Amino acid sequence: MLQTWAKLAYEANLGIVYGSTLIILLLPLIGSFMPPNLVSSISKLNAFTLLESYLLPVLSNFGIFGGLALGVGSAIAFSVLNSIASSFLNLSFNQQQALTIVVALLVSQFIFGGWATFALFLTSMLGSVPPVPGLAVIMSFITPFIDGLIATLGGLMVVLSILYELSEIGLVTLP
């Protein structure tokens, strides 16, 4: 039963990770179409706020090339980390792939925001509803709840995704 839920969480989480990573990589390009406060909010969603508060503005000066540089840099970093881990741990090819996905899931949550980026876009869309008497008050209560719910579910799905990957390579047995 847990195996089935973990697989569903894994597949959903990969979609969110790829989507939010794509948003961040294209942020220098689409930043001109978004309000500046939304762009700055996205860049402050993760653990590396200090790095990205300097990195994203510099990359945005180069437009799409800045996004590509960030993507290529991330890919090189994943490749180097994977080869180092594989040589130390003496892993098979399938285990290397699983380790890469686990590392990518974790790193994407911190560097690219992952579920936090999704929550920000959802709550900003809810916040941009045309002002209707009484609706603004309701939205001010609902938006933080939705944000917290998405963050909690996102964290749970990341854990389930990692458990699923570890079970696929035989390190963990799920019921």
From Swiss-Prot:
Disulfide bonds: none annotated. It is a multi-pass membrane protein. One of its GO terms (cellular component) is membrane. The chain crosses the membrane at residues 14-34, 58-78, 101-121, 142-162. It is found in: Host membrane. It comes from the Viruses. It comes from Acidianus two-tailed virus (ATV). The keyword Aminoacyl-tRNA synthetase does not apply. Keywords: Host membrane, Membrane, Transmembrane, Transmembrane helix. The keyword Transmembrane applies. This is Putative transmembrane protein ORF175.
